[in-house]
Amino acid sequence: RKRRGMYDEIVDRLNRISQFAPSTGVERGRRVLRNCGNPEKDLKIIHVAGTNGKGSTCAYIAQILQSNGYKTGLFTSPHLVDIRERIKINGQMISKSDFEEAYNAVENCRTHELAYFDYMLVMAMYYFKKQNVDYVVMETGLGGRLDATNAIENPVISVITTISLEHAAILGDTVEKIAAEKAGIIKLGIPVVCSGVVKEAARVIKSRAEEMESDCCVVDENTFELVQNTYGYIDFLIHNEYYKNDCFRLATNALYQMENASI
């Protein structure tokens, strides 16, 4: 019978850890990142929050960066089959040996109880720094303001996708309240790109951006225009200060992906 390796034991250990822990995720995240030498401070991070489309938007951003020659880290959740799907560089999952090393690094420097997501976040930052990536695309777990990813204080840009009612017991029972939680990722003077399709949410996000003296680029239904929806793909135009009726093609028939790709 094959002996179980250290990697399998670590995954079992992580799977037994609570999804939640005392104090808020952002407080725990700050503390453990500090204890681990703040690896995130050397990284160029694109921080993505939202209710709908944040996974797709992260994938588009990462692929665009990678296609332009940048070594790109991608941190997402949840995973479908393999826990290592959450931590990728240029589309490749972290190796089992690097996963072990990252876990041990976090375990050796933590001084308090962590939730499952905290481990994954700090392991990702450790690995991305060690691999010297050019950019990191980072998806929030739940919400924004109190999410562990919000311990990252120096993103290069914040991104907020479409907002709708979700996790009402935790984040709020109106679109505006949920938008306020998501807008909590906006940092002083750091630009933000957000969806403007849900007007009530966009108002809250723009207001927060003004308070934080952050330039805010809003992507709404006037930004993109369907040209054709044919078997297997969509052609659409983008109109903004960067593109004047430039045509793009997506290998999907899901029309909502026009908005995610435009963001």
Question: Where in this protein do the model-derived segments appear?
Answer:
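A generic structural signal for residues located within well-ordered alpha-helices
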Residues: 24, 56, 117-120, 181, ...
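ATP-dependent carboxylate-amine ligase catalytic core
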Residues: 26, 30-34, 38-41, 67-153, ...
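Aromatic/hydrophobic pocket-lining residues that form π-stacking "cages" and hydrophobic walls in ligand
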Residues: 61, 124, 205
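Short glycine/threonine-rich catalytic loop with a Thr-x-Gly-x-Asp
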Residues: 72, 252-263
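A short glycine/serine-rich beta->alpha loop
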Residues: 109-113, 249-255
